[in-house]
Amino acid sequence: MVYVDESGFSKHQPRTHGYSVKGKRCYGKHNWGEKGSTNVIGALLAGALLTVSLFETTINTDIFTAWIKQDLVPKLPQSSVVIMDNAAFHKNQSVKKALEQAGHILLFLPPYSPDLNEIEHKWGEAKSKRRKTQISILDLFPLPCL
């Protein structure tokens, strides 16, 4: 089974904890109005990232469909079962057609069940690592993944 999903990573990951003198509040500086994030689409196979792509734009139907056709399908093992959540652009007919023509099966998770999508845990681990180490997004997902 191959789990597919996307996630957004803020350009800057502010620390969630800090140190101060006992009894004094800890303050930090961060521009919360700052714009910009990197969107990531990835596929998880047997607990490891099969492929990851980074985008400096919003993920939409066209981008997701192109990623499926150009990146994911060529890397999938034969007769894979591809599992996605219910995002509107996941349910596009061209996505289904591309996977089925390549001999794969597409399944959708029940609505509002991110806990069933194993790649969600990988995104959580990546965001946690990024917060703790302040690692760049390019270093977080070195290419190639495998």
What residues fall within each predicted segment?
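Short functional hotspots at interaction and active-site rims
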Residues: 1-146
